[in-house]
Swiss-Prot record:
HAMAP family: FolE (MF_00223). Its EC number is 3.5.4.16. It comes from the Bacteria. One of its GO terms (cellular component) is cytoplasm. It comes from Streptococcus thermophilus (strain ATCC BAA-250 / LMG 18311). The gene is folE. Belongs to the GTP cyclohydrolase I family. This is GTP cyclohydrolase 1. Toroid-shaped homodecamer, composed of two pentamers of five dimers. The lineage of its organism: Bacteria, Bacillati, Bacillota, Bacilli, Lactobacillales.
C-alpha cells in the first residue's frame, strides 16, 4: 500500500464525519484494521495479471483448456463495496505452449484485488492471457453479485451480472464460441 498511515487517518476522519467517536473502545483499532484490510484487498494494484504466467510449458495440446468456477472478490470502484463471484477462463493453445492451471486463477486474483469494474476485470484477465501465451483463442466469463446493488440503491440481492470477453477464434468463429459457452455452463 502506498501510505498506510494516510489510510488510517482517512478512516479515523471518516468515522468522525459519520458522527462516531473513533476513540471509543470498539473503534479504537478500526482505522488500523481497515488500512490493513485495504492493503490486502488492493494488493493487485502493485502487480500485473500478465506477470502471473511464470510457468509456461512446451506441450502440444490443440484443444481447449478451461478452468471454471474460480472464486474471487473485488471492490467496486464506484462505491468501494465488494462484488464477488466466479470467473471461468479458457484458452485454445496455439501449438506447443500451455501454462500452469493455477496461473489462470492467479491472474484473476491479481486483477480482482484493486478498485475495479467487472467489465475491466474480465478484459484484464483475457488480455493478460492473450499477451502471455499468444493462444488461438481466449474466452473469459465473470459472474458476480455486486453489493452496491444489494445493500444500497435498487436493493436487489441475488441479482448477478455476467460479463464476457472473447479474443481470437472465440471472437471470430460462432461455432467455437458456442462450444466454449456450452462447456462453461454445462459442467
Amino acid at each position: 500500500m502506498e501510505n498506510q498511515e494516510k489510510v488510517e487517518q482517512a478512516v479515523y476522519q471518516l468515522l468522525e464525519a459519520l458522527g462516531e467517536n473513533p476513540e471509543r473502545e470498539g473503534l479504537l483499532d478500526t482505522p488500523k484494521r481497515v488500512a490493513k484490510m485495504y492493503a490486502e484487498m488492493f494488493s493487485g494494484l502493485n502487480e500485473d495479471p500478465k506477470d502471473q504466467f511464470t510457468a509456461v510449458f512446451s506441450e502440444v495440446h490443440d484443444e481447449v483448456v478451461l478452468v471454471k468456477d474460480i472464486p474471487f472478490y473485488s471492490m467496486c470502484e464506484h462505491h468501494l463495496v465488494p462484488f464477488y463471484g466466479m470467473a471461468h477462463v479458457a484458452y485454445l493453445p496455439s501449438g506447443d505452449k500451455v501454462t500452469g492451471l493455477s496461473k489462470l486463477a492467479r491472474a484473476v486474483e491479481v486483477a480482482a484485488r484493486r478498485p475495479q469494474l467487472q467489465e475491466r476485470l474480465t478484459d484484464q484477465v483475457a488480455t493478460a492471457l492473450e499477451e502471455a501465451l499468444n493462444p488461438r483463442g481466449v474466452f473469459v466469463m465473470v459472474e458476480a453479485e455486486h453489493m452496491c446493488m444489494t445493500m444500497r440503491g435498487i436493493k436487489k440481492p441475488g441479482s448477478k451480472t455476467i460479463t464476457t470477453v472473447a479474443k481470437g477464434i472465440y471472437k471470430e468463429d460462432r461455432e467455437e464460441r458456442k462450444e466454449i459457452l456450452s462447456l462453461m455452463r454445462d459442467f
